[in-house]
């Protein structure tokens, strides 16, 4: 049995608090991968992470996080770009998470890290090679 550690938050005396809870018997998707990315918020840069989970289920492409419309349009840019390098999106449930959650992600600078992390989750790029990579850029 695989245990997943989740962070649970709440309010106690007007102060946020967090604790770790373990849920036995839950597994992540068979293909999970993460990459470091960066973005701009006004004139300030910030560190971000792009995570993908490819799992069995109805084929869909979900993007989670505080995203601008330009980032949401990445679905089609990624589909076309991956098709041109003979690496089509899998016919499975793809969930892409952009963090940190409190900052609006905008622009096309998240296209490249999203493409790389999808390729790594499919096994077409070794996931261990992405651990020390920072990716920012568009695809076309």
Language-model features: locations:
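Peripheral, non-AAA+ core regions of ATP-driven protein-machinery
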Residues: 3-140
């Amino acid at each position: 049995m695989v245990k997943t550690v989740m962070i649970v938050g709440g309010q106690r005396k007007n102060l946020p608090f967090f604790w770790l809870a373990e849920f036995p018997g839950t597994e992540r998707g068979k293909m999970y991968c993460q990459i470091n990315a960066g973005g701009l918020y006004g004139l300030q840069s910030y560190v971000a992470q792009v995570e993908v989970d490819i799992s069995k289920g109805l084929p869909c492409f979900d993007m989670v996080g505080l995203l601008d419309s330009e980032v949401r349009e990445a679905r089609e840019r990624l589909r076309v770009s991956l098709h041109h390098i003979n690496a089509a999106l899998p016919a499975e449930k793809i969930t892409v998470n952009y963090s940190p959650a409190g900052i609006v992600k905008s622009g096309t600078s998240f296209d490249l890290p999203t493409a790389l992390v999808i390729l790594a989750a499919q096994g077409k790029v070794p996931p261990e090679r992405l651990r020390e990579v920072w990716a920012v850029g568009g695809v076309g």
